[in-house]
Amino acid sequence: MSSELVKRHGHTHYANIPYGYYVLIVSFFYLVFLGVLRIILKPRAAGFNSSKRSRLAQKLYLVNPVVHLPILLVAVLLPFYRHYSISEHATVYIKRLGRLSYALLPLNLLLNLRPNWLLRNNYTYTDLIPLHKWLSRCIIIIAVVHGILFLINWALGESGTLAKKIANPYNLAGVLLFAPLISMIFFSIGPMRRFSYNAFYVIHNLTGISFIFVVAFHARPSVTIPYLLINIAILLWQGFAKFYYAKRTDILSKNTDYQNTNLVNVQLPRMALPDQFEPACHIRISPYSRLHPLYWLYPSHPFTVASLPSDTVVDLIISESHHPKSFKLELGAPYSVINNFDPAVPRSCLEQAKRVAIVCGGSGISFGLPLYRYFKEIHPVEYIQFIWLVKDAYQLKILDKLDTIGLLDGSNDCHAFITRSVDDPNSNQETAPDLEFELESMTQDVVDENGAFVSERDGSPTSKFKFASINLGRRIDWATDLSQFVEPALVDNTWLLTCGPSDLIESGRQYAADNSINFASEIYAL
């Protein structure tokens, strides 16, 4: 039997099996490497003025694909060209590309686990999404190059070789896989993904499943053991988690003021979440039941929980899009709430922080509010400052809808910054009004030298919540508004937490880097 195989396939038929095992071993040690990184590196921010070493450490800590992908690819490609001459055994290396793409699949699937039970103590699954995206693209490109090179090799062979090779059912399976792979590349382009995320997500899932099983049929020698079995085990776990950790629930209430703001408050029953969960965790919501096919094909939607475990309801604060196709939670419709996922805030912050500043924009209040309450009520710290940036005063009133904040008093440490005037008739439009008009509108109010309310005008659409100050017509000045925040002796236990658009987060990161303090963030749209 063995002599027949050698005659049919040649002595290089099994040449790539050791290389596939090598890639699998590298994947295992890379996961160990990820775990060790969060133990030895601190969540210190690095900015423009930081050293190269600090910027590299930050990229390593944040699992930035710019750093992590080259590390991984260099490790797996080091022994790629080995033993066989490429001029005499070109097909060995073409096959090796195919085995490389499939051998990387287990790692890529593990990076996409939700929640990631392998790295749960150190990472949230959102930390690993950028690397998962870029590794997916690399796998697809490697697989496509593998296929193209074989087609070229056959086309350059003897007459009729190409047709004969494609007629082989194993080879035909690989050729047919081109269509979903090319579609995946096309729909993963930013504009196409934004145009129809549902289409991208469906193609992403179907292509992934097809790749796992079609390549298992296509590959020779077989990749069933161990690769296919590992991939199936991971898929089964993902399916189990998405089914078992989901609860079907209705919406208790939806508080809106569409005439003045797109911020809405949605309340879910307390039973939608387990007895204990961490502040600023998030859930994913699907409009479909677990038995509906679209529950598995279409994406679920993430929402940050604005409540604490002691609350009687689960509050969500959402910035609703005006786009007719955007997902909206509506009264009277049942939804599936999938799991609760850990927040972007490290456990070390929740357990060891002594000085905390929270800066959030717009619907990022759903991230900041539970953390603010946590550091005031559950884990009191010696210094807490909460800053909320909003487009207009009407957005502040969303706090009046929250029964969960109870008697919370922000009169000493909670500050609002309103970037538009309450008198501006276009305050709900996307274009920012002229700053001079904003400043003129403040002349009827009593303000301090920083532009903060010290008394409110009758009829002003501000919240009943007790703020220390409400600042009109200006954004945060990090150095001034947080002038009492940083104590040099306590920087190891000092945390700046930000949530909002990327510009706000990058400004916060720069401030944290300049002051050598810890930093954590979550990106929202303001």
Swiss-Prot record:
- Membrane spanning stretches: 17-37, 60-80, 96-113, 138-158, 172-192, 199-219, 221-241
**SUPFAM superfamilies (UniProt xref):** Ferredoxin reductase-like, C-terminal NADP-linked domain
Superkingdom of source: Eukaryota
Q: Does the keyword NADP apply?
A: yes
**UniProt subcellular location:** Membrane
Q: What does this protein do?
A: Probable cell surface metalloreductase. May be involved in iron or copper homeostasis.
Annotated Gene Ontology MF terms? ferric-chelate reductase activity
Annotated source species: Zygosaccharomyces rouxii (strain ATCC 2623 / CBS 732 / NBRC 1130 / NCYC 568 / NRRL Y-229)
The alphabetized UniProt keywords are: Electron transport, FAD, Flavoprotein, Ion transport, Membrane, NADP, Oxidoreductase, Transmembrane, Transmembrane helix, Transport
Q: How does it sit in the membrane?
A: Multi-pass membrane protein
Q: Where does the FAD-binding FR-type domain start and stop, copy by copy?
A: 238-370
Q: Which residues form a coiled coil?
A: none
Q: Which Gene3D superfamilies match?
A: Nucleotide-binding domain of ferredoxin-NADP reductase (FNR) module
Q: Which residues form the signal peptide?
A: none
Q: Does this UniProt record's set of keywords contain Membrane?
A: yes
Which Enzyme Commission number(s) are listed? 1.16.1.-
Name its GO BP terms in alphabetical order: reductive iron assimilation
Family from the record: Belongs to the ferric reductase (FRE) family. AIM14 subfamily.
**Domain (Ferric oxidoreductase): residue spans on this chain:** 97-214
Give any Gene Ontology cellular component: plasma membrane
Q: Can you say what this protein is called?
A: Probable metalloreductase AIM14
